Structures are given as C-alpha cells and as structure tokens.
Amino acid sequence: MEDPEFADFWQLLGYHDVITPEIQRMALAAEVFWPCEIYYHAPADVRDGMIHALLSTEDFSEASNLMCCLAFQGDNRALEILLELERSPRPWRKRLYVDPSSYAQIGGWTFDKKGQKIQLNFDTCYPMVKGTTGEKSPVRIGRPREDTCPHCGGRMVDMLVLDGRDERLRFLGLDGVLTAACCPSCVGFLKGPAFNRFTLDGGVEVFPSELFDGAEKTDCYVRPEDYKALTENPFVLGKTPVPLFYGAACQDVNTIGGFANWVQDAEYTACPHCGKPMKYLAQIQWDTVFDCAEGTLYVEFCPDCHIVSMQHQQT
C-alpha cells in the first residue's frame, strides 16, 4: 500500500469507483493479476482471457491469483469455471490450502455443492462518520450493556446496533433492529467467532463461547477509560453511500455493507444453526473507537436465522 501505484489504484477504486474496462484489458495484457480487485465485474473478453490463463497454467501460485481475479469478475461463467475446478481438481490444487469455492468468497460470493451461487456481501456501502453531539443515527457502535463476560468479568458491549428500517439501510432487508453483542476484550481470544441471536425488536441472546486455549478465565484487557471511549464514540451513519471498496484498503474506516478490509484472509462464518455461510455486514476498526487497540472486528449475519457473528483479525 506504500507504493504509489497501489495508492493510485485504491484511490481510483475505493474513492472514485473508476476502474474501467480499458484498464482491466491493459492489466490482462500485461499479465497483472494482483491486486485482484482490479478485475471487479470485468467484461466478458477480459473474463475469457483470465479463464484461458487459469486453465492453461501449471503453476499453483499463478492459479491462486487467477482464481482470486475470477472471483472478483464474478459472473455466471466465472462460477462455472470455479465449480468445474472444484469438481475436477487440477494437479496444482494439491499445493493450495482451500477449494475454489473458498476463493470465490474473496469476491463476495460462493457456491454450494449443487453449483448454486450464494451472495455473501451487499452491493451498497455506507461509511460511519464522526457526527455532532447528540446527533441521532440508525447505526450505533458501542452501546454499554449491564451483563459481564463469563471469561474476563469485563462489561459486555453491543458493538453494533443497526435499525434496518432507516431508508439508507433498506438494502439489508431487515425490518427492525439488529444487535451484535460481545466482550470487546475477549472476542479476539475465542475459539471461533462470537455469536448472538437477535430479534427485530432489539432483543439479544448471547451464545456461549470458549477461549482459544481452553481456559475458563482470563484477564480483562479493556480499561475503564477504554470502555468509556468505546461507548461514547461519535460515529454515526453517513448520509450518502460510497463506492463498494471504500473501506477495503483503509485501516481507519468503519463501514456498513460493501467489501471488507480483511487483515488476513476473507472469512465468512457458517451459521451455527443452518450451516449456510453468513453475509458480511460491517467492519469496525478497533483503534477508531479507543486508543492503543489493534485489529478489526468483522460483523456478519444470517438473514434467515437472525444470528450474528463477530470475529477479530489483526496482523
């Protein structure tokens, strides 16, 4: 991201949304397959060029990059090719860690065993911006709770409270309130994500969780002044949408919808009730809500089961 070429690319994509077919054709001709986001919704001729390269290569690293690019292109033909490679693996598959269906997730979608496409993100994105004192917002980050964490004894927090009835949030398909509650100290030390069930009237049922090391108790690393900063932060929902990749390359941007800035790999949680992959909803950068915090909290949800997952990533 420090290279000027990367900075220019992310300025064009994240803030101006102007990666054109001409740029995509030039990238393909130069065999530039990273960053893979450059091929988002590329035209059919570019897609076919990537498919030809993918089906011709014997190099696992090149195949990995090309599958990422094809995932961001994301049309039905891209799905057909990734499904074909999942069902009939090439020799280079043995050198990769995950199947083509997991590569598809990088582009915000995947497919099931029957080849049915599953959309994992939304085609609308809103930023969280700093508001004025007392400004009302349909989205709140960091609402205090009365209950305490069973692991560290610290205060639980509603990390995200979102009212889907606001006109800006209609794209989410939520006719009520979604609440995502967790322990801000322990969420990064759990064996898997934190989960809760939500009801559209604002209710929350926090699911049991386990620490990654199997211990029952741990220290609370969030200080009282951190809780205060978190629960009194000034963020409100922005008034207008932004490009889908607005938050995908910045470490200081909180967003609803669009694409995430995954610190590690894109990771879509399976719903603990129905088993389907959850949809990406929001990202909260910890250091935007209290000092000296690291990493990002990713919020996903299952629209059918009304279950939320919260997972932490950091370098």
Map each language-model feature to its residues:
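Preference for intrinsically disordered or flexible, low-complexity segments
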Residues: M1-T315
